[in-house]
């Protein structure tokens, strides 16, 4: 009976060790970075490759470095010549600093979408309909520049609107 009890105890300990070690080893893909927190304090961004964390003490947040394309929902805008128009946009952006993207803002994707929506309304509200229709490329560049400046502190680079 002692042999069965001690072997089941060893088996239980072995299972717990395997579970803890499986939680300690993470794989970060080539297009991702893992932002590591140790006891709530930032350690830095690691990856790509195999990352070993201290169980229970370390926590990792994965951040994709790939370009994200996001539809900006249609916005009802009144132009400067009081013509109501409905405009939507597509914004392309990517994370250039994973630590800033995790620490500076709670959800960088949602925040970038909100900035793009408000910027779209404000930029188009300053122009009349004819200017908007004839100089769409200039309006897109202005939108891209403003959104990029506002998301820069978050480690986000807006490439195209």
Name each model feature, range by range:
Residues 1-161:
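N-terminal hydrophobic membrane-entry segments
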């Amino acid at each position: 009976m002692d042999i069965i009890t001690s072997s089941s105890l060893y088996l239980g300990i072995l299972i717990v060790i395997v579970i803890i070690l499986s939680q300690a080893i993470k794989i970060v893909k080539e297009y991702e970075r893992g932002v590591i927190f140790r006891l709530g304090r930032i350690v830095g961004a690691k990856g790509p490759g195999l990352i070993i964390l201290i169980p229970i003490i370390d926590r990792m947040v994965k951040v994709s470095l790939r370009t994200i394309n996001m539809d900006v929902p249609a916005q009802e805008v009144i132009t400067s010549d009081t013509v109501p128009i409905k405009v939507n946009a597509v914004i392309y952006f990517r994370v250039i600093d994973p630590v800033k993207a995790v620490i500076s803002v709670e959800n960088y994707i949602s925040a970038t979408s909100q900035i793009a929506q408000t910027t779209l309304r404000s930029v188009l509200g300053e122009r009349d309909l004819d200017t908007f229709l004839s100089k769409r490329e200039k309006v897109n560049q202005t939108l891209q520049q403003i959104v990029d400046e506002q998301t820069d502190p978050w480690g986000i680079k807006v490439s195209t609107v």
